[in-house]
């Protein structure tokens, strides 16, 4: 694995080819960077290779559920991450766009040990990041993040055979089914559902309607 550089000049051949990762993006419980100022797509591939190497190092079954939030660049980020995971010999189950809790739900629904959710959470556009874990229902804590950081930044990722990719449809529907269950409103209720044009806009209105709530939608477009 090529050792990532902390900085590469943008709009150059090297920026398109060489992994760049700002070390401070590795935090206690997840990873977060400004994109593309602090991490580039090759850098995200290096992160995937490092995460896959960590999974093998821990002796965990090499299967992972992967998802992304609604940001228009998150799909590219996820695909770069997946490339690194596959390079590390990981079987990838791509569930598409999702909420973070839905990605964690997918670990149990698909019976896979690991998860990686491409999201910058509440950060504004221009940020990206990854929430990850491989000891369900736990996500990475300080020890796991420190180990991952060292693997990635030291260039210790190991390529292995056996990587694969599968797009898994239907997880959103299963997630909503699980949330709603057999719940029904005991009395009529009218609510304004305003998600701020976030990822929840693809879930919340349908969820409330299925519960029997009259929904007034506001700012629910991605």
Walk through the language-model features, giving the residues of each.
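Residue-level "edge-of-site" marker
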Residues: 39, 98, 120, 220-221
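Short, acidic Gly/Pro/Ser/Thr-rich loop/turn segments
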Residues: 54, 123, 198-200
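Ferredoxin-reductase
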Residues: 59-136
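Gly/Ser/Thr-enriched, mixed-charge loops and adjacent short helices
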Residues: 15, 128-222
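An N-terminal, well-structured beta->alpha segment
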Residues: 2-83, 87-88, 168-189
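Short glycine- and Lys/Arg-enriched binding-loop motifs that mark or flank ligand-binding interfaces
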Residues: 26, 92, 125, 192-194
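Active-site flanking residues adjacent to catalytic metal/cofactor-binding acidic residues
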Residues: 29, 68, 118, 193-196, ...
């Amino acid at each position: 694995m090529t050792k990532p550089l902390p900085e590469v000049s943008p709009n150059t051949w090297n920026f398109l080819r060489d992994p760049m990762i700002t070390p401070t993006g590795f935090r206690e419980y997840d990873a977060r960077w400004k994109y593309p100022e602090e991490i580039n797509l090759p850098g995200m591939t290096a992160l995937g290779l490092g995460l896959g190497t960590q999974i093998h190092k821990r002796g965990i079954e090499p299967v992972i559920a992967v998802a992304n939030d609604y940001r228009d660049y998150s799909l590219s980020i996820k695909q770069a991450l997946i490339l690194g995971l596959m390079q590390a010999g990981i079987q990838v189950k791509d569930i598409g766009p999702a909420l973070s809790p839905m990605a964690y739900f997918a670990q149990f629904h698909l019976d896979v040990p690991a998860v990686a959710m491409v999201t910058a959470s509440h950060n504004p556009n221009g940020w990206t990041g990854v929430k990850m874990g491989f000891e369900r229902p736990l996500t990475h804590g300080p020890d796991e993040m420190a180990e991952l950081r060292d693997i990635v930044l030291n260039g210790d990722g190991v390529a292995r055979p056996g990587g694969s990719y599968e797009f898994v449809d239907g997880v959103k529907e299963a997630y909503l089914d699980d949330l709603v269950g057999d719940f029904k409103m005991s009395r009529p209720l009218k609510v304004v559902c305003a998600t701020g044009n976030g990822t929840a806009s693809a879930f919340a209105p349908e969820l409330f309607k299925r519960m029997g709530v009259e929904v007034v939608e506001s700012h629910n477009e991605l």
